[in-house]
Each structure stands twice: as structure tokens, then as C-alpha cells.
Amino acid sequence: MERLLITLILVCTMNNITNAQNPFYGQYHTPHEAVPFDRIETEHYEPAILEGIKLQNAEIEAIIQNPEKADFTNTIEAFEESGKLLDKVVAVFGNMLSAETNDDLQELAQKIMPLLSEHSNNITLNEKLFARVKEVYNQKETLQLTQEQKQLLENAYNSFIRHGANLEGEAREEYRRLTTELSKLTLTFSENNLKETNAYQMLLTKKESLAGLPEIIIEAAAETAKNEEKEGWAFTLHAPSYIPFMTYSDNRDLRQKLYMAYNTKCTHDNEFNNIDIVKKIANTRMKIAQLLGYKDYAEYTLKKRMAENSKSVYKLLNQLLEAYTPTAQQEYKEIQELAREEQGADFVVMPWDWSYYSNKLKDKKLSLIHI
């Protein structure tokens, strides 16, 4: 009866919100259910995320309150199917936050991310839920499961373990605190990086500064400057602007200027400095890993990867280094020789020269004609 009541509540809730003017509720009704970004507004995210959290909490409660013995269907499969709305919204929100953010999205992220971290902890640290998952896991050898079901069971159980399900007392609360802190730190790091990237512009006002650049890149730079109500050509640290400039610009000083701006992001004495943030992230990750019984965060992360441990990673890197070094040295020699043909015998190729001269070498070897 109680399980039926919870199900009815879920159905009623979904019926109510489906009628709302929010694209996240219900199907998108687009080809292949592609995300309708043109219909999604900033104000749609928060209510949908909060509703998604509420719905998944109800779904988790239904699993816990199920009077039947825990089995693959009523526990593992039910857990896998939970949180569909939340996953749907968070996937879009996360992508927009990293690819096309704005002040409103960043402000919302500061509010939402701690809630998502808390929600995740509430699930993986739920003792009753983990008890049912563990009950199914302990009888995995006797269950008639397909390979896919076995993998899902293994993944579900290990995910709980990796997210603190076996911790007790103060260790459990410390895990909550550390993961919440880590979510805030990583968000701040990403926001600082994005803000500093967006804030930088190299404005050129002399036509001769554009030597070597394709016309399409010059036009794009002029449009960027125009959008900022500036005269000239504006180049940014975004890939569509940065990469072509480093590849084609004949002006070495400007290449160096843009290169240094790109590679020293968030290290300057301003509000976007990430140096202390990086240290805090590393230390917090270390504490989490050690709390879970690992030597360090690398060991924790690699446990579920193909490499499995740091030793295997370094072994592979050393093998690659040995295999690729002769080729890299030959390529550098060819690029250095080409650069010296143009600039003189004392010229030394620097990092901001690499894309420029490697592109010239490619053109020379392949006899490419740029249209």
C-alpha cells in the first residue's frame, strides 16, 4: 500500500509539471530527441533540477520501502532507472556552463552545485539503500544474470563503495564535508578559467599587424571588435581565434604575446587567480582518497581505469617517450632548419613559433595551396 502511494505521488507530480512551460518536462519532440537549446531559458534549470532531485528522492524511497526481498529488478534496475529528469537537466546545464556561460548561469551554478553534491551524498551514503544493493551483490554468483546485468550490478556496488558507503561515524561526515568543498572548488576553478578567457582581447589597429592571416580570420576579428564597439581587429583566447593566429600570423611578437596570455591564464594578480585553488583541490582530493583507503588520488582514480595504478601509467609514458623521441627530434630539426632559412642562423624556435613553422613545413613538404 505504501509503495503504491509513493507511485501515485510520483505520477501526479509528473502530470502537474508536464503541463508547465518548461522544455525539460516530458519529451522534447525534436528529431532524435535532440536538445532544443532555442527553447531553453536560464529560468528553466533551477525548477527542473529541484524537481528532479525530489523525484529521485521519491524513487529511492520506493526502493528502500519495498517489502519484497532485494533482487536485481527491484533494487539494481530500479536504482539505474531513477533520476532520469535530473540527469537530463544536469547534462544540458553542465554543457552550457562550460561552453556558453554567462553571469546568470554562473550565479545559478554557485547555488545548484552544492545541492547536487549533497543529493549525490544522500544517495551513496544512504545505509538502507546500500544494504539492499549489497544484498543483491552478495548473491551475484547464484543469480541468473546476463553479462550486461552482471556489469551493471558490479558498477552499482563499486560506485557506492567509491563514494563512501562503507564509511562510518565521523569519517562519513568528513567525506560529506570534503566532497561538498571539492565541488565548490572545482566550480570556482572552471569559472575563473572561463572568465579570464572571456576577459582577454588583443586589439590590433594597424593593418600590417595582420600579415599572414587568412582573410576569413581577419573578418572574424573585425566582427569581434565591432561587437565590442571597438575599431580594429580583436583576437581572443578562444580556439577559433587563438589557433589560426598562432598558425598563420607572421608577427612573432604578437604570437608570443597571445601565447603567453593563453598559457598563463589564472596565474595573474587578479580575481581570477587559480594558484591557491589548484592547491586546495589537490589537497582535498588527497584527503578524500585517503579517507577511502587509498594512498593518493591517483590510486583512487586509476582503480577503475584500464591502467589500474600509477606504475602502469608511468611505464606506458616511458614507452611512448622512447618510441616517439626520435621522430620528435627529427621534426624539431626540420622546423628549426626551415625557420633559420628565413630568420638567420642564430634563430631559435620558441613555443610560440611551433605552430607557425610546422604549418610552413607542412605546406613545403606537401606543396599545399591555400585558397
Question: What kind of region is each of these model predictions?
Answer:
Residues 164-175, 265-280, 287, 291-298:
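A conserved hydrophobic secondary-structure block that centers on an alpha-helix together
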Residues 34-41, 94-98, 161, 263-271, ...:
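Glycine- and acidic
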Residues 21-214, 219:
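N-terminal helix-rich structural modules
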Residues 1-21:
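Bacterial Sec-dependent N-terminal signal peptides
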Residues 57, 161, 176-179, 186, ...:
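Alpha-helical coiled-coil heptad-repeat register
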Residues 152, 184, 191, 196-236, ...:
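Active-site-proximal, well-structured secondary-structure segments within enzyme catalytic domains
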Residues 73, 143, 224-225, 259-277:
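A short, flexible low-complexity segment enriched in Lys/Arg and Gly/Pro that occurs
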Residues 230-266, 354:
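Active-site-adjacent "gating/activation" loops or surface patches in catalytic cores
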